[in-house]
UniProtKB/Swiss-Prot annotation:
GO terms for biological process: L-tryptophan biosynthetic process. Mg(2+) 1 binds at residues 94, 228. Belongs to the anthranilate phosphoribosyltransferase family. This is Anthranilate phosphoribosyltransferase. It comes from Nitrosomonas eutropha (strain DSM 101675 / C91 / Nm57). Pathway: Amino-acid biosynthesis; L-tryptophan biosynthesis; L-tryptophan from chorismate: step 2/5. The gene is trpD. The lineage of its organism: Bacteria, Pseudomonadati, Pseudomonadota, Betaproteobacteria, Nitrosomonadales. Anthranilate 1 binds at residue 82. InterPro entries: Anthranilate_Pribosyl_Tfrase, Glycosyl_Trfase_fam3, Glycosyl_Trfase_fam3_N_dom, Glycosyl_Trfase_fam3_N_dom_sf, Nuc_phospho_transferase.
Length: 341
């Protein structure tokens, strides 16, 4: 397998066979492919559009090479990690949703990193509220079990990514690596709310997660480009549940929520993102809380803590109103800081 031959095939708009893609990803992850070639391959795949097989093969390799977290009871384990790269610069909706889901007794294995293309990544905002990021796999497993939520700082678990990280940073555009992060949860969460930057990826990633053994997942893309369930208009959903995939569209009005432009959710800095996150967890009414209700409700549903998405939204509303979601945030801050003393 020569990367040059694979690149030539990609430029002809042809798919890379599964085994060759596995071999290529292992070579990239071990530093045996030059930065220039890695950049060319990632750009070529993006222009061709990555296939289900290519994505699944690459995710399989990343899963093999990742540090793993063992959570004793993982039936209700859920991740709310999205691809990012939507260019919308909203506050950290999936991070806020993670605390609400944890308050609803879902076990949240939140996976994420620093910002690549947004104003604040999940790691940036969690650090800003006082959470210690550098925890061991055992400590995070304990956090998930005892607090109900743990945060896995992606660079600490995907050491093999160090070879591709400089290329990804320098390119500054969405590539296969944006897609892989949410498919490679170190705790092996089989339930996911996964936001994507492109509508076409909803069905593709549902198929990839099916092949990778997921249990219940919702892959979502807002009509405004948001890699979340949006409140500004329709959201395209591909839902994987017990081996079946169903595709449909929802509107905020379906859940009794008012349609609002996403400009009110945009931030210019990590501190802006922190302030908006805390405002939601303080249950301040408005578009930020509404969009978290939609997304947290979906996370609660896929985690098996609600029989329907609508019920999940009502549970989310209750957990914000009671202060339980904010308590989860405070508990995680306390737990993570105990580890450093």
């Amino acid at each position: 397998m020569k990367p040059q031959a694979i690149l030539a095939r990609i430029l002809e708009q042809r798919e890379t066979p599964y085994e060759e893609m596995v071999e290529l990803m292992r070579a990239i992850m071990s530093g045996n492919v030059s930065p220039a070639m890695t950049a060319a391959l990632m750009t070529g795949l993006r222009m061709k559009r990555e296939s289900i097989g290519e994505i699944t093969a690459a995710a399989q390799v990343m899963r093999e090479l990742a540090l793993h977290i063992e959570v004793a009871d993982s039936v209700n384990l859920v991740d709310t990690c999205g691809t990012g790269g939507d260019g919308c610069n909203t506050f950290n909706i999936s991070t806020a949703s993670a605390f609400v889901a944890a308050a609803a007794d879902a076990q949240v294995a939140k996976h994420g990193g620093r910002s690549v293309s947004s104003k604040a990544g999940s790691a940036d905002v969690l650090e800003a509220i006082g959470i210690h990021l550098n925890q061991t796999p055992d400590q995070i497993a304990q956090s998930i079990t005892e607090v109900g939520i743990g945060f896995m700082f992606a660079p600490n678990f995907h050491h093999a990514m160090k070879h591709a990280a400089p290329v990804r940073r320098e390119l500054g555009v969405r590539t296969l690596f944006n897609i892989l992060g949410p498919l490679t949860n170190p705790a092996g969460a089989k339930n996911q709310l996964l936001g994507v930057f492109n509508e076409d990826l909803t069905g593709i990633l549902a198929q990839a997660l099916l092949r990778l053994g997921s249990q219940h997942a919702m892959i979502v893309h807002g009509s405004d480009g948001l890699d979340e369930i949006t409140i500004s208009g329709p959201t395209k959903i591909a839902e994987l549940k017990e081996g079946e995939i169903r595709e449909y569209t929802v509107q905020p009005e379906d859940f009794g929520l008012e349609r609002t432009a996403i400009e009110s959710l945009q931030v210019n800095s990590t501190d802006d993102a922190r302030v908006m996150l805390l405002s939601v967890l303080d249950n301040h009414p408005g578009p930020a809380r509404d969009i978290v209700l939609l997304n947290a409700g979906a996370a609660i549903y896929v985690a098996g803590k609600a029989d329907s998405w609508a019920e999940g939204v009502e549970i989310a509303r209750d957990k914000l109103a009671s202060g339980a979601a904010k308590e989860k945030m405070l508990a995680l801050i306390k737990f993570s800081n105990q580890l450093t003393h």
